[in-house]
From Swiss-Prot:
This is Outer membrane usher protein HifC. It comes from Haemophilus influenzae. InterPro entries: Fimb_usher (IPR000015), Fimbrial_membr_usher_CS (IPR018030), FimD_plug_dom (IPR042186), PapC-like_C (IPR025949), PapC-like_C_sf (IPR043142), PapC_N (IPR025885), PapC_N_sf (IPR037224). Keywords: Cell outer membrane, Disulfide bond, Fimbrium biogenesis, Membrane, Signal, Transmembrane, Transmembrane beta strand, Transport. One of its GO terms (biological process) is pilus assembly. Its main location: membrane. The lineage of its organism: Bacteria, Pseudomonadati, Pseudomonadota, Gammaproteobacteria, Pasteurellales. It is found in: Cell outer membrane. Pfam families: PapC_C, PapC_N, Usher.
Length: 837
């Protein structure tokens, strides 16, 4: 193999690219004489006489059915002898994504056979349109042949497990303070990490702390180094359960009843596995259309849903959960123009579920408090069910050897507001005291939203617990106390008796916002009632923002009454900078503060704050802080001093270390699910995540948060990568499972200019318009006039390439190559391409 390096004339190079374009537009006839006429071997140029012609091969495309996006997938085109051109293959993966009725498909693909089943034969009633320039594949088919799914539905088979990897989140904070009399130091390290292997995720969290105090007299108090274990569990999800299974140390996650720590097993539903339009509460809308009609659903004057339905009964059950309350107005516009409407009551303020939806949890194991595990074995079951548009039922059972509790309740949606109520019965046993207690607790709440007068929200909640009502934590704690202090009397633990809360927020338009709240509560073991009130008002005057907060708390047992007032002002000082001031008074104490804060940097990666304060007793303090965020974490520092000669300094850093198949990557702290990006040779390219992340020296980066069971778009902005790095694509789709670590590979090339002058064993040049693929089936270039393969998508310095001008073995050849991908000059190689014997 000969190798030559030479500069290529730019005009000739551009002409080569144009001639290599395989697509002919509109109905233009392809003139084969421009390519040498009959001297070209085996190429049927008639394939390019159709619009958007495409060569055989594998392509990436966004899939659409009747203009509804279904997701991203690889698609395959193969030569169809019946039509003389490459046509779309109907693969099992494509069949799954299209989500069509069985009667729409007359010929199904065979997952065990690579034979191409052409989509035009498999779905004769559909019309496919592949738009190569936009990388889109569109199918138009009668709506009756599609399976109606909730909006945003993603088949569980498309959920991605992710890659095997390990990570550790860390949060380190060092604090030092002192004055002439005493000095102290403390160190805190918070950890949360895990390992993913297959469908399982192992997670652990804990913290390490130490401190040291030293007085001016020389006395030193060194605290013990202490590591506190939190949760340690193994978890995976199951589509069949619409939930997950957790084994180990964890906290129960019931939305009703009591939550606590366990060492054991939990099976619980996960609402995130539902389509986005099925999460939260929204009513099912039912109606009847007399003709082919347009149905519009409005809330608070805005159209939130619209669909065309055929004549007859219709059901709409995929409304997105709204963040606002307000009845739904359903308008039916018939084909003759007549419009009729009806109202569906709706409030999102009660614990409501959609009709037919179920939320559950079953947990059992040994009781845990902090990092301690006790002998008491606990079993808990929780069930919530949406019975109708207006009624949701809630229930919970809790069982241990010395404690039982049962809860039953409901959420009710009505035109005059949302109600919820529940009753809990408890039976607590204290064996060492030979005493058992039976009690109950009643809870009720009411909420309503008056949108007509400016989004006025009222919320009231009341709970009453009888004298003999004990929670699980009360019972276990008391029994442990009795065992530790034999013969001790029944200690006081301050169990709630009455609790009442009310709050109201009111938008006043241009006059600002008003918020009122109040609560009162008392205990069986204490006399008197504690009461708290709060009034808050906020508004702006031109660019000045201001707020006032008044509060009062009353303890009738001690007769203590605390009144406080807080006033704050904030004034913008240009982009991302502001000055703020506050005044507060509590009793006889008055404090004033003045500060400046903001952010700066190309991506606002730096932030700062400077404050000065004083009180009415002559005390003054000054403090400042600075923080920085980048791809590998966040860093913070602060300093303060006051008029009493107290000084303090703190330093902090938080981030994550992620180990994966491409190495070890430093990152910002990661969430439950996150993604690893790998793009070879693309160091410096920015990640389009809004998280101030760039690819490191090795072409790796971490997107710290992804949304499970949803389509996530992971993108790269290549502008800061080396100029000769070429991306096959700059955006990918992933659909991660909960707790998954996704690996997103972006194929890149150094855009090395390599020309292979290919000849066949008989001395003829390889046919023009042939395509070349690497051993993995990836496209690397086209053959132009004279058998020249322009290969600008090589990803490996050596390997084997396959050149095709048809699907038969006699219409293919292969050759091995070795090039220098770091060479910026054009490389030219003379090679004989070997055909099958």
């Amino acid at each position: 193999m000969k190798t030559k390096n030479f500069p290529l004339n730019k005009i000739a190079f551009a002409c080569t690219l144009l001639l290599a374009n395989p697509v002919a537009w509109a109905e233009d006839q392809f003139d084969a004489s421009l390519w040498g006429g009959g001297s070209v071997l085996g190429i049927d140029f008639a394939r390019f006489n159709v619009k958007n012609a495409v060569l055989p091969g594998r392509y990436e495309a966004q899939i659409y059915v009747n203009n509804e996006e279904k997701g991203e997938s690889d698609i395959i085109f193969a030569d169809n002898p019946a039509t003389g051109r490459a046509e779309l293959c109907f693969t099992p993966k494509l069949q799954e994504m299209l989500d069509l009725m069985d009667e729409a498909i007359v010929k199904s693909p065979n997952s065990e056979d690579d034979t191409c089943v052409f989509a035009s034969d498999a779905i004769p009633k559909g019309t496919f349109d592949y738009q190569g320039g936009d990388m889109k594949l569109k199918l138009e088919i009668p709506q009756a042949l599609t399976i109606r799914r909730p909006r945003g539905y993603i088949a569980p088979s498309r959920w991605q497990t992710g890659t095997n990897a390990a990570f550790a989140n860390y949060d380190i904070n060092y604090y030092r303070s002192g004055n002439p009399e005493v000095k102290s130091e403390s160190l805190y390290v918070g950890l949360r990490g895990g390992v993913n292997f297959g469908n399982w995720a192992l997670r652990h969290n804990g913290s390490f702390s130490r401190f040291e105090n030293q007085s001016s007299s020389g006395f030193t108090d060194k605290g013990k180094n202490h590591y506190e274990r939190g949760d340690t569990y193994l978890q995976r999800d199951f589509a069949l359960l619409r939930g997950n299974v957790t084994v180990g140390d964890f906290f129960s996650t019931a939305r009703i009843g009591e939550n606590f720590g366990l060492r054991g097993l939990r099976i619980a539903s996960d609402d995130r596995m539902l389509a986005p339009s099925q999460r939260g509460f929204a009513p099912v809308v039912r109606g009847v259309a007399n003709t082919n009609a347009k149905v519009s659903i409005k809330q608070n004057g805005y159209t939130i849903y619209q669909i065309t339905v055929p004549a007859g009964p219709f059901v709409i059950n995929d409304l997105y959960a709204s963040g606002y309350s307000g009845d739904l107005t359903v308008e039916i516009q018939e084909s003759d123009g007549k419009v009729r409407s009806f109202i569906v009551p709706f409030s999102n303020l009660a614990p409501l579920m959609r009709v037919g939806h179920l939320r559950y949890q079953l947990a059992g194991g040994r009781y845990r408090i902090d990092s301690r595990t006790f002998d008491e074995r606990v079993l808990q079951g929780v069930l919530q069910y949406g019975l109708t548009n207006h009624l949701t039922l809630n229930s919970s059972l809790l069982y241990t050897r010395h404690y039982r509790a049962g809860l039953f309740g409901f959420g009710l949606n009505t035109p005059i507001g949302a109600f919820s109520a529940d009753a809990t019965w408890s039976h607590a046993e204290f064996p060492l005291k030979k005493v058992s207690k039976n009690g109950y607790s009643l809870h009720g709440s009411y909420s309503i939203n008056f949108n007509e007068i400016g989004t006025n929200l009222t919320l009231a909640a009341y709970r009453y617990s009888s004298r003999d009502f004990y929670t699980l934590s009360d019972t276990i704690g008391l029994n442990r106390t009795f065992r530790q202090f034999s013969g001790a009397y029944l200690p006081e633990i301050y169990r709630p008796k009455n609790q009442f809360q009310v709050s109201l927020s009111q938008s006043l338009g241009n006059w600002g916002n008003l918020y009122l709240s109040g609560q009162t509560y008392n205990y069986w073991e204490k006399r008197g009632t504690n009461t708290q009130y709060q009034v808050a008002y906020s508004n702006s005057f031109h660019i000045l923002n201001y707020s006032v907060n008044l509060s009062q708390s009353i303890d009738k047992e001690t007769g203590k009454r605390d009144n406080s007032i807080y006033l704050s002002l904030s004034l913008p000082l240009g982009d991302n900078h502001s000055a703020d001031s506050s005044y507060s008074r509590s009793g006889n104490d008055i404090n004033q503060r003045l500060g400046v804060n903001g952010s700066f940097g190309e991506r606002h990666q730096w932030s700062y704050g400077i404050n000065a304060s004083r009180n009415n007793q002559g005390y003054r303090s000054y403090d400042g802080n600075l923080s920085h965020n980048n791809s590998i974490g966040s860093y913070r520092a602060s300093y303060s001093r006051d008029s009493l000669k107290n000084r303090s300094t703190s330093l902090g850093v938080s981030g994550a270390v992620v180990a994966h198949k491409y190495g070890i990557t430093l990152s910002q702290p990661v969430g439950e699910s996150f993604a690893i990006i790998h793009a070879k040779d693309a160091a410096g390219a920015k990640v389009e995540s809004g998280a101030n992340v760039s690819l490191d020296y090795f072409g790796n980066a971490v997107v710290p948060y992804t949304s499970p069971y949803e389509i996530n778009y992971i993108g790269i902005n290549p502008s800061d990568a080396e100029a000769n790095v070429e991306f096959e694509a700059t955006e990918r789709q992933i659909i991660p499972r909960a707790n998954s670590i996704s690996l997103v590979d972006f194929r890149t090339g150094k855009n090395t200019m390599v020309l292979f002058n290919l000849t066949l064993p008989n001395g003829e040049p390889v046919p023009m318009a042939s395509t070349a693929q690497d051993s993995e089936g990836a496209f690397v270039g086209d053959v132009v006039q004279g058998g020249v393969l322009f290969a600008n998508k090589l990803t490996q310095p050596k390997g084997e390439l396959i050149v095709k001008w048809g699907e038969r073995e006699s219409e293919q050849c292969r050759f091995h190559y070795q090039v220098d991908l770091d060479n910026a000059q054009i490389q030219n190689h003379d090679i004989q391409c070997k055909t099958a014997e």
